[in-house]
Amino acid sequence: IFTLKDLSVEAFVKKIDGYKSGKFLFYIDSPDPLKEFEKAFTLIQAGGGVVRNPQGRILFLKRRGKWDLPKGKLEIGEDISECAQREVEEETGVKGLFVLGKRVVTYHIYKQDQRWYLKETHWYNMYSDGREDLRPQKEEDIEVCAWKKPKKLKKLLKNSFSSLREVFKGEF
């Protein structure tokens, strides 16, 4: 456990640099701790979808060797649910999606080009009739898109990102 008295947010980020993954508890004594934490990062907002078809299968994609869900960055002037729908369509080729409602918001941090980012992803439950051919968006390093049975979820998530596991928390 780290507290703001012991360590600034910036010092905390430097301390965890080099860890591949993990959970860290960081207490910030502030009326708005998230806002205080965000100051150390460049905030990236994104939208994504948990898409199910009539058979109850879930749409996954494989990106850089890991199973993932379709998601992407919010564009200027775009609503976050529109972003989620657009990203699912672009990354998988699925059209005619029904956005059923917000599922969860996840956060993760990463370092790129010597800069730290906080990615806030808004996840939505979606439905598709599943008739379209899946078309992985190669320019986003997506190798394959596939409808997966929910009973395979636990195994799939072992080769995934920890923030994605939060999206399915309580499902198995």
Predicted regions and their residues:
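Acidic, metal-coordinating catalytic segment for phosphate/diphosphate chemistry
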Residues: 5-48
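Short connector loops at helix/strand junctions that flank enzyme active sites
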Residues: 42-47, 64, 119-121
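Conserved beta-strand and immediately adjacent loop positions that scaffold enzyme active sites
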Residues: 48, 57, 144
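Intrinsic-disorder-associated interaction segments
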Residues: 2-5, 157
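Conserved Nudix-box catalytic region and its N-terminal flanking loop in Nudix hydrolases
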Residues: 2, 52-89
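Active-site beta-strand termini and strand-to-loop segments that position acidic
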Residues: 51-54, 126-128
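Unchanged
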Residues: 74-162
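Charged phosphate-binding loop/patch that engages nucleotide di/tri-phosphates or the phosphate backbone
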Residues: 163-172
